[in-house]
Regions:
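Phosphate/nucleotide-binding beta-alpha loop and adjacent structural elements of enzyme active sites
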Residues: 1-291
Length: 291
């Protein structure tokens, strides 16, 4: 089980010679359709030999020690085998935002909503350095165990992890893990008494409790609940808390609110898009920087 794996120290699950060779090969493939097809075929030679669901390997990524579980989490699998293809548009935009904060001589403030096992938070910590402030929010226990293991393997990172869900109103929500792909974990209103529940917080309430004065970048991926979290935030939050940059999963087909129109009204414009995500930048903050 995951608990026994995470109880071992980093390095105990280092890839053996064959696994290292496959990972080295898949990590060098071109970031195109053919490269991805080859990587999918080759990585099966490794994953089929790992225990299901929580088999893991210890590797270095972004200069950090990370234990990655490729059998039941797509983001961990992708970073393990194809780091050169991993969220390239998203990470490039975050790197640009970190550079902007550096030019302002300000520590980078990042809020990671629906953090999964924390890969975006770890990337920002590696790139922005110890002056950063990272707040990661994740409701699912198994994801949190993996997150905390990698935190322990990299002591001193400027990441605070909050075990909670975010929602449009405070209360308790049921957690529904997706055991085939942990990135698909959902939260919803409890239907009966036997469910695992977690505290639901309001985004503005959380930022206030954490003493946040501003936010440079906010990433939100919560399986269709993005509108219920951000709509009340932009209704009630002071402008100083509006993020300079937002990375959001495009789930408009299930939203109750036209969130992209709302963000446009608040002065955000689309900076770039990827297959699943949209990245928006505050034109107000850019105008202030140019003054």
């Amino acid at each position: 089980m995951a608990a026994s794996i995470e109880s071992s120290t980093f390095g105990a699950l280092a890839p053996q010679q064959f696994d290292r060779a496959v990972i080295a090969l898949t990590s060098c493939l071109p970031n195109n359709w053919l490269g991805l097809r080859l990587a999918i075929l080759l990585r099966r030679l490794v994953t089929v030999r790992l225990a299901y669901p929580d088999g893991a390997l210890d590797v270095m990524r972004w200069g950090l020690r990370l234990r990655l579980h490729p059998r039941d989490n797509g983001c961990e699998k992708n970073l393990l085998f194809t780091p050169q293809m991993y969220e390239t548009t998203e990470l490039a935009e975050l790197t640009a935002e970190i550079a902007r904060a550096n030019r302002r001589r300000a520590g980078f403030v990042f809020v990671d909503i629906g953090a999964n096992v924390g890969l975006f938070s770890f990337f920002v910590a590696a790139c922005a350095g110890p002056s950063a402030r990272i707040l990661a929010v994740e409701p699912e226990k198994g994801n949190l165990e993996r997150f905390f293991f990698n935190m322990r393997a990299n002591p001193g990172l400027p990441i605070r992890v909050v075990s909670a869900a975010l929602a449009g109103e405070a209360g308790m929500l049921a957690v529904e893990p997706d055991l085939r792909d942990r990135g698909g974990t959902r939260v919803h209103q409890s239907m009966h008494g036997g469910e695992v529940t977690v505290e639901a917080k309001i985004l503005l309430q959380l930022l206030t409790q954490e003493g946040m004065e501003s936010v440079d970048a906010l990433k939100i991926d919560v399986e269709g609940m993005e509108d219920s979290i951000l709509s009340p935030f932009f209704r009630d939050a002071p402008q100083r808390l509006w993020p300079r940059f937002i990375l959001i999963e495009d789930a408009r087909t299930v939203w109750d609110t036209d969130l992209f129109s709302l963000l446009a009204e608040k002065g955000y414009s689309v900076a770039s898009r990827s297959r699943q995500n949209v990245m928006l930048r505050s034109q107000r903050s850019l105008a202030l920087e140019s003054c």
